[in-house]
Amino acid sequence: MGGWRKLAEPALPVLDPAQRLLWCGIGGSLLPSETLVRAFGNDRAARNWVPLASPERVPEFQLQSGDQLVFASKSGKTLELWTWMARLRALPGFGDLAAPVLVTQDDANPLATWGRANGCRILPIPVEVGGRFSAFTPIGTLPLAWMGHDASAFLRGGREVIGQIEVDRGPWRDRIAATVEMLLDAHRRGLTEWVLMPYAMRLDSLSAWWVQLLAESLGKVAKDGTRKGFTPIRAVGPVDQHSQLQRWMAGPRNLGVIVMTVEGAQAPEKLDPPPGSPYPGLASLQGGDILRAQAEGTTGALEAAGVPVLRWSLPALDEREVGAFMMAWQAIIGLLGFALELDPFDQPEVEDGKKRTFKRLGLG
């Protein structure tokens, strides 16, 4: 499953950003898309992005004229996807919409087979790319293109990381090696829980993507029969420094925290504290100043308490830098898996849960 290191750039269909994009998928077929829409989407994209993941019914959901459909599933067999397909087909107006775009393996899987029979455009996920490693397939590039953002720059960021790994030199190669070494050393000392805490609300969904990547790849029975792995914890700085920080500092010493910040100039703003504000000095500050101080304050408090901290700074919140970050972590996960003598690219226990679900539903 090492195909995630080869980044193709297939032609993408033109989607209208002024119309809703209904994205049916879950897990690795949704989280990269959700990450990029939340990171880069404007107000219009936020309104028009409609992820359809859980099989539960959404009250009062109706199709609208101009809705654009994407059905995304690497295997083409995802139960939640087929549930939403059935639900959408039963709604008034489905037959008036353009044929859905499919993002899946271009093989004989049920989704691809249905798509070919119904005139759908198929954007392929390479067979050798695991679902949770699919950010650099159309799972990631299609929503970027829909929003009018630079999908090529996103891929370029990923390629830069892979290029440095292949020649075994460069800042990304060094950062990846240092991170792997730190996490392995922590693992040997019993620190198996790690928090990713970006100080940027736009990166909240990036933490969700990272959680799946880490948990599904590295929670395994190793070759020697021992249970190994890491437990990832999702957080976002401006929120969770007021909630989870207490446990991290005063609770069991079995975790570390990755504090992620974004550098670069912020758009200027004016703060006008009212009379009686306990913080009149806000008039000379901006929100970005406060966010940076919070990140440094939290990091300092964690380090003073003896909690391992990995500082990770993005030079800018743009497609290239986010692409590089996501590719770096895919590489980190692969290297950690091999070092722990487990397969980071399978998920047998997930498959067991699916089989039990199908049996209970009488679906196979």
Question: For the regions a protein language model found, what residue spans apply to each?
Answer:
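Acidic catalytic cores of enzymes that act on phosphate-bearing nucleotides/polynucleotides
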Residues: 1-4, 11-12, 149-152, 165-301
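Internal helix-turn-beta structural module
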Residues: 308-309, 314-354
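Glycine-rich phosphate-binding loops that contact phosphosugars or nucleotide phosphates
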Residues: 13, 17-169, 355
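Active-site-proximal helix-loop elements at catalytic-domain edges
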Residues: 1-6, 100-102, 313-321
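Non-catalytic alpha/beta scaffold blocks inside enzyme catalytic domains
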Residues: 127-155, 294, 301, 306, ...
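Structural beta-sheet core signal
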Residues: 23, 69-71, 102-103, 196, ...
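Cofactor-/ligand-binding subdomain signature composed of acidic, glycine-rich
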Residues: 1-19, 336-343, 347-349, 355-364
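Short helix-loop-beta junction
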Residues: 36-48, 90-91, 213-225, 301-304
